[in-house]
Amino acid sequence: MQKMSSIPNVIFILCDIANNIELLNSTFDKKKFDVVLSDMAPKACGNKQVDHANIINLCEMSLEIAVKFIKPNGIFITKILQGEYEKEFYQSVKYHFNSVKYFKPKASRKDSSEMYLVSLGFKENLEYI
């Protein structure tokens, strides 16, 4: 995990998200946010399929958090790698948001499968799938 410099009006929690859902629940109890942004990435092992599966797992956790804590019409942005489970995850995000688009930053290498999903218009009152 990498530390991050503080940013005004941004709450930053450095933790293992897989083991600290309760920390998030207690910290943000009943609070809702305009944006949930996930730049999480697992440590790469070099096997593209394993690396892809690991980042999709993090994406699913970040989506679950977004669905719980985001305001109606809110924004969810998450880092993703192209691969076998990408379309299924895209459909899960599309279920919860009105618009979902891929974005590849100019700083990203052209041969990299790293992208971001930018999701706008959170649909409130849908159960997490």
Swiss-Prot record:
One of its GO terms (molecular function) is rRNA (uridine-2'-O-)-methyltransferase activity. The active site is at residue 79. It is an enzyme of class 2 (transferase). Keywords: Cytoplasm, Methyltransferase, rRNA processing, S-adenosyl-L-methionine, Transferase. Its EC number is 2.1.1.166. GO terms for cellular component: cytoplasm. It is found in: Cytoplasm. Pfam families: FtsJ. It catalyses: uridine(2552) in 23S rRNA + S-adenosyl-L-methionine = 2'-O-methyluridine(2552) in 23S rRNA + S-adenosyl-L-homocysteine + H(+). Belongs to the class I-like SAM-binding methyltransferase superfamily. RNA methyltransferase RlmE family. Specifically methylates the uridine in position 2552 of 23S rRNA at the 2'-O position of the ribose in the fully assembled 50S ribosomal subunit. PANTHER family: RIBOSOMAL RNA METHYLTRANSFERASE (PTHR10920), RRNA METHYLTRANSFERASE 2, MITOCHONDRIAL (PTHR10920:SF18). This is Ribosomal RNA large subunit methyltransferase E. It comes from Ehrlichia ruminantium (strain Gardel). The lineage of its organism: Bacteria, Pseudomonadati, Pseudomonadota, Alphaproteobacteria, Rickettsiales. The gene is rlmE.
